[in-house]
Amino acid sequence: MNSSSNEKNKDLNRKNFSSKTDSSNNKAVVLLSGGLDSTTCLYQAIADGKEIQALSFDYGQRHKIELSYAKKVTRKLGIPHTIQKLKPELFLGSSLTQKSLHVPKNSLRKEEIPNTYVPGRNILFLSFAVSLAEGTGSDSIYIGVNSMDYSGYPDCRPEFIKMFEMAIQLGTKKGSQGPSIKILTPLQNLSKKEIVLLGNQLKVPFHLTFSCYDPKNGKACGKCDACLLRKKGFQETGVSEK
């Protein structure tokens, strides 16, 4: 890296990424896929002093290997971890769940929503998280959605999160009788470069994360959106994945 890049990275490293994102009670549900973003989000929740229940989903995704990384991280941290199994038939029309569809390669940032979008996925995931949060007395849900360096999914936008929070307030006992459950999105406005820098600051074990939509024999393809964005983040920072 040249000197100007080094100076920019120093400035980003000095940025207080890990300031607390929530000041309510100490219980939270964290949606954890096993990828870079959700694992960084998990470590942010730890930095916020939360007592965490991690929640993952097995929905027949072709990148199910991510779940093994989620298990490794939660075991390392000693955090309770639930993996909820959902029928793949609920998620038709996506290349992540239908092997007859091809995962786009080398096509980062096209205008149309890619076929890796999974219909209703975050709606369902957040609904399960709300149920778990209300049942465990948690005041917040962490989700690693991002609307900067991302594939363009509509259920990752801040507008969606805001509307879902309104639904929680209107549709839950907790929301109608007192402070509602918050959805916290600490990565929402960060570039992939900034997410890597945040993870590095939070001491995320990057080697225990996996980001690929179309892995083969346990290895990342290196060409899908998830791989390209991950590579971009680490290349721009000079931070090691190991």
Curated annotation (Swiss-Prot):
It comes from the Bacteria. The keyword Protein biosynthesis does not apply. ATP binds at L32, S33, G34, G35, L36, D37, S38, T39, T40, C41, L42. Belongs to the QueC family. Catalyzes the ATP-dependent conversion of 7-carboxy-7-deazaguanine (CDG) to 7-cyano-7-deazaguanine (preQ(0)). Its cofactor is Zn(2+). The keyword DNA-binding does not apply. It catalyses: 7-carboxy-7-deazaguanine + NH4(+) + ATP = 7-cyano-7-deazaguanine + ADP + phosphate + H2O + H(+). Residues 1-22 are annotated as: Disordered. This is 7-cyano-7-deazaguanine synthase. Binds 1 zinc ion per subunit. GO terms for molecular function: ATP binding; ligase activity, forming carbon-nitrogen bonds; zinc ion binding. The lineage of its organism: Bacteria, Pseudomonadati, Spirochaetota, Spirochaetia, Leptospirales. InterPro entries: QueC, Rossmann-like_a/b/a_fold. One of its GO terms (biological process) is queuosine biosynthetic process. Pathway: Purine metabolism; 7-cyano-7-deazaguanine biosynthesis. Its EC number is 6.3.4.20. Zn(2+) binds at C212, C221, C224, C227. Keywords: ATP-binding, Ligase, Metal-binding, Nucleotide-binding, Queuosine biosynthesis, Zinc.
